[in-house]
């Protein structure tokens, strides 16, 4: 029997290996809202969490129980009470909260413990640990309203949690915590997850929502937000009356977490099978990241970037789109190059060759990785190169191109005669390539 070759599997594995190495030994806090737990895809999410654990990632799983609590209250004819969009947990409600949270804890523990069954890792034991790792305190009274048993975190025993993580356990934490006086309090899962991520110096905080992430006005996924942008989105959603959706709750926590040192917070869909793995083990992910520092950077190239630039431009050189450059030439001209990097991979580059006497510059060797050509990376490079040219006192910018004539025309370049090139460039013009000359005023 001839076995079918799975090229996609091979390529996917090659791309994921660097992330496996990067994530090993790091601490991730995963926030599972009650909506995610109710969904049919939850068993797949649990399996993927088990897979992360098997790869050596230290995991703290925080679960919420909002819809389960509401259902339990309704079943006992107990009307939920809210003040300023926060649940008021009276004595009767607290018992129903504890009941819902306790059942979820047992269910999630059982699922995580057997999450690697029916996989090649069957037989590997996963130890799931819960405990009194958080101390709660009451929210108190606000505008004359007593929140009763609704509380907030007073402190976290991060040393005890780290000991469990060091021992290879998954730490599972729910929405009920006790105070120093032994009283129980109902906490929000987003507050628990956020404070845990900060205290444990987690690499990532991950949350789930019904959509694939944060969407723009056209319904497309926004792949990356800075905290101020995420905060603006929270305020926008709240203005529309959305105070407690999974997206809003997670974004509130993500803003605080990022500003307190958590490098990346990820919001993904609980409805999409494999979204957790796609987000963590691919270059572009599948959801929305909230980050203090972008995964993508534009900067001047250094000698260490030569390998990445060569890998990017070689296919274009072989197709005749770019003029071939040797490694030696690239080493001598590396200070002319600007690159865009994403997760340490060079995805775009361009060079600026100034002709100072003529006050004109050439933008050359413009290349964008095929996966990113539908985005705005080319425009970002053009803006950066134009800014560099202005700083040098140059007044015009020209390009020689055989394939991208319309792209440059759409961005203010106009075709000109070869005679308008600087004298030294004119002498080097390759009449066999017959490249078109386009020029723009830098203004």
Curated annotation (Swiss-Prot):
N-acetyltransferase domain ranges (all copies): 296-443
Class in the EC hierarchy, top level: transferase
One GO-annotated biological process of the protein: L-arginine biosynthetic process
InterPro entries: AceGlu_kinase-like_sf, Acyl_CoA_acyltransferase, Asp/Glu/Uridylate_kinase, GNAT_dom, NAGS_kin, NH2A_AcTrfase
Functional pathway: Amino-acid biosynthesis; L-arginine biosynthesis; N(2)-acetyl-L-ornithine from L-glutamate: step 1/4
Cellular location(s): Cytoplasm
Pfam families noted in UniProt: AA_kinase (PF00696), Acetyltransf_1 (PF00583)
Keywords: Acyltransferase, Amino-acid biosynthesis, Arginine biosynthesis, Cytoplasm, Transferase
Keyword Cytoplasm: yes
Annotated EC: 2.3.1.1
GO molecular function: L-glutamate N-acetyltransferase activity
Catalytic activity: L-glutamate + acetyl-CoA = N-acetyl-L-glutamate + CoA + H(+)
Gene Ontology, cellular component aspect: cytoplasm
Assembly notes: Homohexamer.
Family to which the UniProt record says this protein belongs: Belongs to the acetyltransferase family. ArgA subfamily.
Name of this protein: Amino-acid acetyltransferase
Organism: Salmonella typhimurium (strain LT2 / SGSC1412 / ATCC 700720)
């Amino acid at each position: 029997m001839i076995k079918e070759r799975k090229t996609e599997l091979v390529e996917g594995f090659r791309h994921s290996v660097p992330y496996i190495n990067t994530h090993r030994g790091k601490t991730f806090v995963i926030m599972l809202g009650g909506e995610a737990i109710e969904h049919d895809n939850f068993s797949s999410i649990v399996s993927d969490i088990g897979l992360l654990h098997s790869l050596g990632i230290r995991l703290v799983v925080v679960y919420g129980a909002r819809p389960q609590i509401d259902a339990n209250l309704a079943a006992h004819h107990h009307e939920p009470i809210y003040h300023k969009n926060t649940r008021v947990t009276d004595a009767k409600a607290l018992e129903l909260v504890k009941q819902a949270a306790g059942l979820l804890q047992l269910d999630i523990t059982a699922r995580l413990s057997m999450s690697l069954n029916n996989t090649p890792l069957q037989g590997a034991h996963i130890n799931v640990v819960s405990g009194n790792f958080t101390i709660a305190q009451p929210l108190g009274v606000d505008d004359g309203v007593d929140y009763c048993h609704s509380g907030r975190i007073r402190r976290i025993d991060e040393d005890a949690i780290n000991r469990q993580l060091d021992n290879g356990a998954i730490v599972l934490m729910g929405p009920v915590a006790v105070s120093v006086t032994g009283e129980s309090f109902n906490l929000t899962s987003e507050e628990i997850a956020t404070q845990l991520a900060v205290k444990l110096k987690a690499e990532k905080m991950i949350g789930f929502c019904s959509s694939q992430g944060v969407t723009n006005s056209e319904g497309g996924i926004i792949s990356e937000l800075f905290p101020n942008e995420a905060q603006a989105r929270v305020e926008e959603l709240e203005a529309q009356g959305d105070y407690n959706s999974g997206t809003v709750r997670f974004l509130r926590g993500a803003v605080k977490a990022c500003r307190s040192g958590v490098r990346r917070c990820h919001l993904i869909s609980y409805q999409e099978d494999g979204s957790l793995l796609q987000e963590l083990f691919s270059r572009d992910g599948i959801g929305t990241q909230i980050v203090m520092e972008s995964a993508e950077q534009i900067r001047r190239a250094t000698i260490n970037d030569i390998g990445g630039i060569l890998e990017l431009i070689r296919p274009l050189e072989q197709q005749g789109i770019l003029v071939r450059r040797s490694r030696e030439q690239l080493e001598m001209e590396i200070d002319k190059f600007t690159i865009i990097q994403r997760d340490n991979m060079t995805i775009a580059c361009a060079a600026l060759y100034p002709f100072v006497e003529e006050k004109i510059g050439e933008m050359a060797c413009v290349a964008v990785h095929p996966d990113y050509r539908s985005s705005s990376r080319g425009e970002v490079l053009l803006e950066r190169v134009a800014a560099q040219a202005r700083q040098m006192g140059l007044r015009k910018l020209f390009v020689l191109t055989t394939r991208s004539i319309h792209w440059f025309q759409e961005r203010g370049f106009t075709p000109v005669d070869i005679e308008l090139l600087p004298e030294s460039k004119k002498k080097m013009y390759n009449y066999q390539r017959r490249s078109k000359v386009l020029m723009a005023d830098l203004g």
